[in-house]
A protein has these predicted regions:
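Active-site loop/short helix in cyclic nucleotide turnover domains
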Residues: 14-19, 52-62, 74
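Short regulatory alpha-helical coupling segments
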Residues: 23-45, 68-72, 140
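A short pre-motif secondary-structure segment
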Residues: 69, 79-82
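Signal-transducing coiled-coil linker helices
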Residues: 1-19, 23-38
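Active-site-flanking beta-strand signature of metal-NTP-handling nucleotidyl enzymes
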Residues: 45-55, 80
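Short helix/loop segment flanking the catalytic signature motif in cyclic-nucleotide metabolism enzymes
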Residues: 57-65, 89-108
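A short glycine-enriched loop-to-beta-strand structural element that forms part of the catalytic core
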Residues: 48, 82-93, 112-140
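Catalytic cores and conserved motifs of cyclic dinucleotide signaling enzymes
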Residues: 60-65, 99-100, 124-149
Length: 149
């Protein structure tokens, strides 16, 4: 007996993509970030990560809407991942002006998203390792509210 899923309901059970938003999983993000940090160290480039935190009271539909806004706001070569239930990250790569790219991404999301969210970004030239970059992103002192700036 063959069971078929309705068209338009993709499922992912391979831990490569998040099954709810279909963005990359945390494992894929960590691997990509390690590669980009190594590349930045070798080539003298910068790598940037922007973290977005959606409020705890956001519904499932609002999370999907935010995930879609991220997808529309990024450049083709950037990578979106969902780290936790309410945390998304965007890996900005292949850009000489990473700081400006971080600012532009946040501004594009602010223009589309009416609800409040928090964000932070961290930049590395390869001298900061994966753990240092992630700790910097988790520092609540650098988290900004979308309504305060």
């Amino acid at each position: 007996m063959e069971i078929s899923l309705p068209i338009g309901t993709p499922r992912s059970f391979d831990n490569y993509r998040d099954s709810f938003t279909h963005h990359y999983s945390a494992n894929v993000f960590y691997d990509a970030l390690k590669r980009e940090i190594s590349f930045a160290k070798r080539e003298g480039n910068l790598v940037g990560v922007v973290k977005f935190i959606v409020p705890i009271e956001a519904s499932a539909d609002q999370l999907l809407y935010f995930a879609n806004e991220l997808e529309l706001a990024i450049r083709q070569h950037d990578l979106i991942a969902r780290l936790t239930e309410r945390e998304f990250v965007v890996l900005l790569r292949f850009d000489s002006e990473v700081i400006e790219a971080c600012k532009c991404l946040v501004q594009r999301i602010k223009n589309m998203e009416r609800r409040e969210f928090k964000f932070a970004w961290a930049i590395s030239d390869g001298t900061k390792g994966l753990e240092q970059l992630l700790q910097e992103l988790d520092n609540p002192q650098i988290h900004h509210s979308s309504k305060s700036l």
